[in-house]
């Protein structure tokens, strides 16, 4: 499979497949394709894994697209202004995505639910208990909100992140919450009560404009009908 990511604010990934090659995606993610791409809808692992995908923000059923009789082309566009990033997934090198980030992947990549190990990170971290775990072997594409900044964390090195800006991280990273120090800072600082701490080793990808922040910014301008 060869691919090209086009566009900046509203990107799309265009994939060129050899005959017989397959890609998986959630329902409704396909933007355009060549006529020889054959679609099959499947639970892809049974009802248990389908329910897990639903918990992680994706649809229960996935579509498998296969290039029939020759080379095929299929494109997947981002659903929100932001970035599409490719990730090379290998056995034992899983990735953790924010909820609903998974866009598409080569057949052989598996999407499942990832529960945060520490209750505090789920209760106060701002994104809930559930994220997405991507495993297997192949290239996976994820869509993130705004631009993406990547950091390589050494063992024990930590970065503190405001709620919602965590886009993805290596499964080797550890996630926890940190309380904002001082009651005055909590009440008047405008940053909330808690931040998320990510500790290496591993890589972390941060997004500049979480969709939740966009929603909060435009909410005061939405007519209420009164």
Language-model-detected regions and their locations in the chain:
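Composition-driven recognition of glycine/serine/threonine/acidic- and proline-rich low-complexity segments
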Residues: 1-226
């Amino acid at each position: 499979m060869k691919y090209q990511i086009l566009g900046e604010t509203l990107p799309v990934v265009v994939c060129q497949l050899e005959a017989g090659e397959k890609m998986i995606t959630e329902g409704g993610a396909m933007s355009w394709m060549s006529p020889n791409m054959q679609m099959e809808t499947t639970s892809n692992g049974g009802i248990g894994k389908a329910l897990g995908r639903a918990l992680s923000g994706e649809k229960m059923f996935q579509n498998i697209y296969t290039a029939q009789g020759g080379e095929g082309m299929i494109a997947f566009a981002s659903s929100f202004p932001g970035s599409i990033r490719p990730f090379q997934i290998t056995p034992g090198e899983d990735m953790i995505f924010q909820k609903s980030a998974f866009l598409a992947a080569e057949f052989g990549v598996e999407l499942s639910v990832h529960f945060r190990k520490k209750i505090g990170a789920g209760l106060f971290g701002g994104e809930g208990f559930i994220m997405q775990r991507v495993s297997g072997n192949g290239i996976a594409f994820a869509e993130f909100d705004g631009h993406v900044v990547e950091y390589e964390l050494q063992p024990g090195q930590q970065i503190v992140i405001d709620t919602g800006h965590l886009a993805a991280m290596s499964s080797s990273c550890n996630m926890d919450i940190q309380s904002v120090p001082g009651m005055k800072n909590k009440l008047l600082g405008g940053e909330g009560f808690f931040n998320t701490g990510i500790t290496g080793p591993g890589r972390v990808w941060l997004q500049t404009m979480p969709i939740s922040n966009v929603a909060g910014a435009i909410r005061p301008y939405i007519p209420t009908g009164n």
